[in-house]
Amino acid sequence: MQVLVDADACPAVIKDMLFRAARRAEICVTLVANQFLRTPPSPFIKSVQVPAGFDVADARIVELAQAGDLVITADIPLAAAVLDKGAHALDPRGNWFSRENIEERLSTRAMMDQLRSSGVDTGGPAPFSARDGKAFASQLDRFLARHGKP
């Protein structure tokens, strides 16, 4: 089991939690981004830089993901793709993507895209909060307790 991170938009506090978890649980955490990312020295942490371009990092994450892996992303289509491969998907706010909720999330995203393209200001997500970080940490710890190294 490895953890793959859609790192371009992942909050720094979440990356720091993942770095600590990698060392503590001795699991591989791979950050995928279209820019260079500085990571702490560890045999459990690596960074993959992909060329800039639309969905290039997402495609690389899908390529790397295997059944049982954990993918950290807020990108709903990416979450759907890794779920199709049997991986787990968690957003940085601690919310799970699942086979049960992904279609609804994709439909909501499509509707919001349509509203924005017709000129409606739909706003954006709320700023990342300490509560979001705590929710993520809790879900990550639960997942690692169940699926981490034996």
From Swiss-Prot:
It comes from the Bacteria. Belongs to the UPF0178 family. Coiled coil: none annotated. This is UPF0178 protein BamMC406_1579. HAMAP family: UPF0178. It holds the Pfam family DUF188.
